[in-house]
């Protein structure tokens, strides 16, 4: 699961850049 964290799909396994 390599995608950006979204409201529908929270941060995956911590590999995606957190947009905060």
Curated annotation (Swiss-Prot):
Anything else known: On the 2D-gel the determined pI of this unknown protein is: 6.7, its MW is: 23.0 kDa.
Descriptive protein name: Unknown protein NF007 from 2D-PAGE
Source species of the chain: Naegleria fowleri
